[in-house]
Amino acid sequence: DKPNSRTYTIHGQADIVEALVEIKGLKSFHLLAHDYGDTVAQELLARQLEGAGAGTWLSCCFLNGGLFPETHRALLTQKLLLSPLGRYLNVLTGFAKFGRNFSSVFGLQTKPSNQELEDFWWLINFNDGKHVFHNAMTYIRDRLEHRERWVAAMQQSTIPVAVINGSVDPVSGAHMVARYKALNCRLDYLAELPLIGHYPQVEAPDEVRVHYENFLASLLTNSGEVSNG
């Protein structure tokens, strides 16, 4: 469902995830997140550390995403969607403009094919989803408002954390990883993919799979040192 009338908040999305965990009866599990999902995962991680989260996390892995508002380099389109012009921009945005914007955050050698762009466009438009984009952009404000809570959760995490990052992502690439390290956030496994952009799971799925499996395997050794992929 993609309701058009509601306000999309990160806390609301976190509530939905926890409701699903409860419905599925999940007791313990690993979490892998990307992009908007990274921010939802930050709120969920904070709840885990408070002892208020649903289920028990065994680990958390962040792919590319705006973990820190000060390093998130939003595209012009995202900024416009967040503005009062957002609802009108939704109407004007077609496949060609989407394709240009979407492709701009991929690596030079891993641009999406036209078929992949069509598939993503179909997913966006399913259930009239394109017309809620401006509502979903409020996550940018949420990141500013709750920065201290969410950054503290990563710094104080008692749960193993991995970062698998496409370095040439203009939105949240190598500069985000540098900030992550500078703030001494928990980091048990790091993989930096030098030619990959914002969507590593699409651009380099095999590399991401191998790194994620390596991270999970490293949890068994529990060496206490950062493992670099």
Feature-to-residue mapping (PLM):
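Conserved loop-alpha-helix segment in the C-terminal half of the alpha/beta-hydrolase fold
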Residues: 156-198
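Conserved alpha/beta-hydrolase catalytic His-Asp/Glu region
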Residues: 68-71, 93-155
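A catalytic-pocket lid/entrance helix-loop region that shapes and gates access to the active site
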Residues: 55-58, 66-67, 71-93
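Active-site loop/oxyanion-hole signature of alpha/beta-hydrolase fold enzymes
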Residues: 1-33, 46, 53, 210
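Conserved catalytic-core motifs of eukaryotic protein kinase domains, centered on the activation segment
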Residues: 1-6, 71-74, 174-175
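Conserved hydrolase catalytic core segment
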Residues: 23-72
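Catalytic active-site module of serine/aspartate enzymes centered on a nucleophile-bearing elbow/loop
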Residues: 186-229
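Generic structural signal for small/hydrophobic residues in well-ordered secondary structure
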Residues: 17, 21, 31-35, 120, ...
